[in-house]
């Protein structure tokens, strides 16, 4: 059987944790930042976990993670 290709965009965006979950970066922190409060931007800096409903899609994109 041929090897399964990894989706390279997903490989750059998600990191697998030891417990089997996936870490991801928060969105909305690239541009148009002046209208966002300091508190909102500070909270967006932290990593978040991929939701359980989306985890199936991430696993399909990263077969060797």
From Swiss-Prot:
GO terms for molecular function: structural constituent of ribosome. Coiled coil: none annotated. One of its GO terms (cellular component) is cytosolic large ribosomal subunit. Keywords: Ribonucleoprotein, Ribosomal protein. GO terms for biological process: translation. It holds the Pfam family Ribosomal_L35p. Residues 1-26 are annotated as: Disordered. The keyword Ribosomal protein applies. PROSITE patterns: RIBOSOMAL_L35. The keyword Ribosomal protein applies. Belongs to the bacterial ribosomal protein bL35 family. This is Large ribosomal subunit protein bL35. It comes from Pasteurella multocida (strain Pm70). The gene is rpmI.
């Amino acid at each position: 059987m041929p090897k399964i290709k990894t989706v390279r965009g997903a490989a750059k965006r998600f990191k697998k944790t030891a417990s089997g979950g996936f870490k991801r970066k928060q969105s909305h922190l690239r541009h148009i930042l002046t209208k966002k409060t300091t508190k909102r931007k500070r909270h967006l800096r932290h990593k978040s976990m991929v939701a359980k409903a989306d985890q199936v899609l991430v696993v399909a994109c990263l077969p060797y993670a």
